[in-house]
A protein has these predicted regions:
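Bacterial N-terminal signal peptides that target proteins for export
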Residues: 1-11
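Cleavable N-terminal signal peptides
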Residues: 13-14, 24
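Sec/Tat signal peptide C-region and signal peptidase I cleavage site
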Residues: 20-26
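Accessory, solvent-exposed terminal regions and/or long lumenal/extracellular loops of proteins
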Residues: 29-39, 126, 181-421, 425, ...
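Surface-exposed, glycine/proline- and aromatic-rich loop segments on solvent-exposed faces
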Residues: 48-112, 170-191, 196
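Short hydrophobic-aromatic micro-motifs
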Residues: 56-58, 156-163
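A mature extracytoplasmic/lumenal domain signature
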Residues: 61-63, 76, 163-166, 206, ...
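A cross-kingdom signal targeting lumenal/periplasmic-facing segments of multi-pass membrane
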Residues: 86-154, 334-345, 350-352
Length: 458
């Protein structure tokens, strides 16, 4: 039996994983590094392409273990038919992650004794089923208040759409049919049943998985129509004893998306920090996120990126092209500019225009701080925002002029400000920061006679 690690992290928050396996000016400057989801061991990712009441939801996975043990249960707002489900390209979530990740940029000071005319803007280079007759099973299902609304196969997945009258019956049905429910599922299933939601249940078809040749399970993509713009995160909390990270990419033709039942807060951005952070950017961003997550009482959604998908400045990765946007679920694209009746591949939604605005939201949640599912709304706000952190390298050549001596004198104040900023952002020890800065930039200091010449204005 193949043992795998799924290629793209799964939205643990959205799924109950039922298995034995262990449980994933302009913005110009030179792009250096990004803080992508690889920083978080259990980072879950979901893509929501939404226009009006129409949504295409792409779900990715970080399940580890035998594929025969993998299964997910996802609350959905309506009955899902076979034509509304497909498997997505495995790299599409990674592309969105790379494009929208918080990024580190760097600048290099010019020679103050030989100033150059700086262009106003500069684009950065890119970073690169069990036995028994069907009649018997139907009778047993009905006695539990569970109805199988649909049953089909998509790619390497066998999929069921269930409705239920009460949570005990659904829990019993799932256990009888080989889905091992974690303790506590009963109480968390109740609110979804009361809300008349359905349950999307998927497990791996081993024969089809072997035939596919893939070494990982591909993301599942679901298209549906509902006024509810939400993610049901509560069910997934059954599996987690620790804080979980959820990254939500919302694609919209309108503008920024936000969480409505919790505050949406911008991640700190546009800060100058010491140049040694270039080699420690992952540690820096994790520490900074934890610091502000704690300051906000651990119950906010952080905005990490909001931008028109057609451009970026600086670019941590190339913007997604038209085909990639379609793979991400965008169904309102119109390549020809005047054909509004084309159909999104695999789904029944027509294209309408080519606006795509991306919002990246980062939620770190626990059951006590996030007792409700996430509710969203899109807005008309098209303001650009990114988590962006700046390295400003000092000029280290000869400074044999008055402007050079003044520049050199100013560096100590600048370095101290960068150290203080880093300490405030991360709660790192200020003395350790200062020591690392000395090792990085060397001993750039002014002598007594240079200070005297500056005092004389020379």
């Amino acid at each position: 039996m193949k043992k795998i690690r799924l290629f793209i992290p799964l939205i643990i928050a959205l799924f109950a994983v039922l298995s034995f396996a262990p449980t994933a000016l302009a913005f110009c400057g030179f792009y250096v590094a990004k803080a992508d989801t690889k920083l978080y061991n259990q980072a879950s990712q979901v893509v929501m392409a939404r226009d009006g009441n129409k949504t295409v939801l792409t779900m990715a996975n970080d399940f580890q273990g035998d594929v025969k043990d993998f299964a997910v249960v996802v609350p959905v707002p309506t009955v899902i038919k076979e034509e509304q489900v497909r498997v997505a390209q495995p790299n599409i979530v990674e592309r969105l992650d790379a494009f929208s990740a918080p990024r580190l940029v760097e600048y290099f000071d010019e020679d103050p004794c030989s100033p150059q005319i700086r262009p106003q803007s500069m684009l950065a280079p890119t970073a690169a089923a069990r036995g028994g007759s069907s009649e018997e099973k139907a009778m047993a299902d009905n006695s539990l208040g569970v109805t199988v609304e649909a049953r089909f196969n998509v790619g390497e997945y066998d999929i069921l759409i269930l409705s239920a009258k009460e949570s005990n019956g659904l829990e019993t049905w799932l256990n009888r049919n080989g889905y091992k429910i974690p303790r506590g599922a009963n109480q968390l299933l109740k609110p979804y049943i009361r809300s008349s939601m359905k349950f999307f249940v998927a497990k791996v078809n081993l024969d089809k998985f072997e035939e596919s040749g893939y070494q990982f399970l591909r993301p599942l993509q679901i298209a549906y129509e509902s006024p509810k713009f939400m993610l049901p995160i509560r069910l997934g909390m059954i599996n987690a004893n620790i804080e979980q990270d959820l990254i939500v990419y919302i694609l919209s033709p309108q503008g920024q998306a936000e969480v409505t039942n919790y505050r949406t807060v911008k991640i700190p951005s546009n800060m100058n920090i010491p140049v040694f952070v270039k080699n420690e950017f992952g540690d820096f961003y994790k520490s900074m996120f934890q610091t502000f997550y704690t300051k906000e009482d651990k119950k906010v959604a952080f905005l990490e990126y909001a931008w028109d998908m057609g451009n970026c400045d600086p670019c941590s990765a190339q913007p997604l092209n038209t085909e990639e946007l379609k793979q991400a679920g965008v169904f309102w694209l119109d390549n020809n500019g005047n054909n509004n009746n084309r159909i999104a591949p695999g789904f029944g939604f027509p294209f309408s225009n080519n606006n795509v605005y991306i919002t990246r939201l980062h939620v770190r949640y626990t059951r006590n701080k996030f007792p409700e599912d996430l509710m969203f709304q899109t807005t008309s706000n098209r303001e650009s925002f990114q988590g962006r952190y700046v390295l400003q390298h000092p000029f280290t050549g000869n400074l044999q002029c008055s402007a050079g001596r003044e520049y050199k004198r100013s560096l100590s104040r600048r370095f101290e400000q960068e150290a203080q900023t880093l300490a405030q952002l991360t709660n790192w020890n200020i003395q350790n920061i200062r020591q690392k800065m000395k090792l990085t930039v060397g001993n750039i200091s002014t002598s007594w006679w240079e200070n005297f010449l500056m005092f004389l204005g020379l």
